[in-house]
Amino acid sequence: MSFTTKVKEELIHLSTGDNNELAAIIKLSGSLGLAHQSLHLSITTENAKIARYIYSLIEDAYVIVPEIRYHQKTNLRKNRVYTVYVEQGVETILADLKLADSFFGLETGIEPQVLSDDNAGRSYLKGAFLAAGSIRDPESGKYQLEIYSVYLDHAQDLAQLMQKFMLDAKTIEHKSGAVTYVQKAEDIMDFLIIIGAMSCKEDFEAIKLLREARNDINRANNAETANIAKTISASMKTINNIIKIMDTIGLESLPIELQQVAQLRVKHPDYSIQQVADALEFPITKSGVNHRLRKINKIADDL
């Protein structure tokens, strides 16, 4: 199950459901038609549970019994499209929800009352997400929530509504419509709280925190690996110089304190400077070890 489906199925099991939610669903996934000189309303979805939920919203609010139809886009079950079909009382529904324009079409913007009332706004956003929303799987680490609208003015109104709840919502226009979206993980979690998907919000946050912890561990491991590689690279240069001294004047020709450091460096090329300092018979500071190594390198360079 995708994360989007998980959110939507949590939403339809909430006890709340009102006309603002239904208005958003109809506006974003509904269409009007004319049959036998009367209007009919079709609301489409690819989720059977959402279709039954829309059916219940209409039946409970208007004592109208819709019909659920379906057809197959392909032979794959997941491409089955469900239509909640209403052929009675459509004018009443449109008038009550303030959805009809003067040309018997659907109004493209959002009612001012929805934009000004917090509770109405929450319900509308819930319906909008159920109808045309999606969230990129948080496991991907690339966060995005978007709601598709047929009309740009609706997408812009939707962004305005989301901005009212302090979300950094933006819109982008496509050939076939417009998208309202947010891309910050914190905004997506806040949106889930606004529409009531608390369980999915907690799941999203847990996945986000786990990814961040993994990334921190990987960064630490990469830094440690880089430091080890740097240490070995530096120590190999010194080891080559020590071998040069051994092959020419002999290690025993060096002062005893340089011999001890040289022997440890050859024996443990992976040791950090601090580890070399700690391993000496009479431990010294890191700067003391560095000073002795520089002396060894200088002697080798002069040979």
Swiss-Prot record:
Residue spans binding DNA: 272-303
Pfam family, one: HTH_WhiA
Protein name listed in UniProt: Probable cell division protein WhiA
Keywords assigned by UniProt, alphabetized: Cell cycle, Cell division, DNA-binding
Record field: transmembrane: none
Family, as annotated: Belongs to the WhiA family.
Entry annotated with the keyword Transit peptide: no
InterPro entries (alphabetical): Homing_endonucl, Sporu_reg_WhiA_N_dom, Sporulation_regulator_WhiA, Sporulation_regulator_WhiA_C, WhiA_LAGLIDADG_dom
Cysteines joined through disulfide linkages: none
Gene3D superfamilies per record: Homing endonucleases (3.10.28.10)
Gene Ontology biological-process entries: cell division; regulation of sporulation
UniProt xrefs under SUPFAM superfamilies: Homing endonucleases
An example molecular function term from Gene Ontology annotations: DNA binding
